[in-house]
């Protein structure tokens, strides 16, 4: 997850090439290192599909939530923030990374050289900590429902803090990212004359390693451990739940409902960890010993790891939105250019959002068993 995966995926040739031990370690100097056209075409299709799904999925999710005023609760506000950051990743990370890795030189100018890795790092940090805040909201909702629970104001404050933290942690890219022709000065190939590369130029290797290690903890291991703990506690609580609503339902329905919720919670954590694990491993190995990765295999291996990580921008809308019946209905209305309308009596809050009901605790106690069962079923759908 380390954000330098994006800058260093841009830098990978440069670090090899500037090595004193192997000054001619350029992948582009060896014709055998070029990827076959069939592989490039397949990767282009895959990247294109992820970009389209990531942009359209997150954009639709944002529009649907913003359109429905009744959906602006804590979780949905955080989901909009998550989708917006994923949208930036899909726009800023995928196309620039793919083109630069294949071409081995930068064609997008000095401003984009600094802005691209900066925006990428900001977006990824925001995405991860949005997942953290959603886990916190869910934890308080299920583990401590009578204690402190975040409201919309808390959500907006949390989002502001996330963006400030993300910008601050990404500033080194704006400071140390440079556009230069230094790696190409001794290259004899005419195709690489007057070409430029974009890479980070830290004061020393120790500075670079310290920063990349910090990002590794900040953007992967730290959030992942925290999210896992939150959802594990939620899983245990849901498994042990034996309240009045559960007793009113038959065991088969209770078992299937509990299983559905637990699988969704587990899938969120697994998707986050699995999507980013290959790139995290690749980036860590590259940071500490880049010579361990064969030059000719570097670009292909990196692109595969990077593509896997970018799939997470498509997974989140599915988990947080499109598995919900209302989003399926509203999405259909969206593509049919219809109004986003829904009746209060059949509208289901987005999965993972704060549960609420118009029925008070007093009326709940006075309700008939049949009515209570119906209310409890609706309540669990809202969980």
Swiss-Prot record:
Disulfide bonds join 113-198. It comes from the Eukaryota. Residues 56-87, 138-154, 233-260, 321-383 are cytoplasmic. The chain crosses the membrane at residues 35-55, 88-108, 117-137, 155-175, 212-232, 261-281, 300-320. CDD domains: 7tmA_NPY1R. Keywords: Cell membrane, Disulfide bond, G-protein coupled receptor, Glycoprotein, Lipoprotein, Membrane, Palmitate, Phosphoprotein, Receptor, Transducer, Transmembrane, Transmembrane helix. Belongs to the G-protein coupled receptor 1 family. This is Neuropeptide Y receptor type 1. It comes from Cavia porcellus (Guinea pig). The lineage of its organism: Eukaryota, Metazoa, Chordata, Craniata, Vertebrata. The gene is NPY1R.
């Amino acid at each position: 997850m380390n954000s330098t995966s994006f800058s260093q995926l841009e830098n990978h040739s440069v670090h090899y090439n500037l090595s004193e031990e192997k000054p001619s370690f350029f992948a582009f100097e060896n014709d055998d290192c070029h990827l076959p056209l069939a592989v490039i075409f397949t990767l282009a299709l895959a990247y294109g599909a992820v970009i389209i799904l990531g942009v359209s999925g997150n954009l639709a999710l944002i529009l649907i939530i913003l359109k429905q005023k009744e959906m602006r609760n804590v979780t949905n506000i955080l989901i909009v923030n998550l989708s917006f950051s994923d949208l930036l990743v899909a726009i800023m990370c995928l196309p620039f990374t793919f083109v630069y890795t294949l071409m081995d030189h930068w064609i997008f100018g000095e401003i984009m050289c600094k802005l691209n890795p900066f925006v990428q790092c900001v977006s990824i940090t925001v995405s991860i900590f949005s997942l953290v805040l959603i886990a916190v909201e869910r934890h308080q909702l299920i583990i401590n429902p009578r204690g402190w629970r975040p409201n919309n104001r808390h959500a907006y404050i949390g989002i502001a803090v996330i963006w400030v933290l993300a910008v601050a942690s990404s500033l080194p890219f704006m400071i140390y990212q440079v556009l230069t022709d230094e790696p190409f000065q001794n290259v004899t190939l005419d195709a690489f004359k007057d070409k430029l590369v974009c890479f980070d130029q830290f004061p020393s290797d120790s500075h670079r390693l310290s920063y990349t290690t910090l990002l590794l903890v900040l953007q992967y291991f730290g959030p992942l451990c925290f999210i896992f703990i939150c959802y594990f506690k939620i899983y245990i609580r849901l498994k042990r739940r034996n309240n009045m609503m559960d007793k009113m339902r038959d065991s088969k329905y209770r078992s299937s409902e509990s299983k559905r919720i637990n699988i969704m919670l587990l899938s969120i954590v697994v998707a986050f960890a699995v999507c980013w694990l290959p790139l995290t491993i690749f980036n860590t190995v590259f940071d500490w010993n880049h010579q361990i990765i064969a030059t000719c295999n570097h670009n292909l291996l990196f692109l595969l790891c990077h593509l896997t990580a970018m799939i997470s921008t498509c997974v989140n809308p599915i988990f947080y939105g499109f598995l919900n019946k209302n989003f399926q209905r509203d999405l259909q209305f969206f593509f049919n250019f219809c109004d986003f309308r829904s009746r209060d009596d059949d509208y289901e809050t987005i999965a993972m959002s704060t549960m609420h009901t118009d029925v008070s605790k007093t009326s709940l106690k006075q309700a008939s068993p049949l009515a209570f069962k119906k209310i409890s079923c609706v309540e669990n759908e809202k969980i």
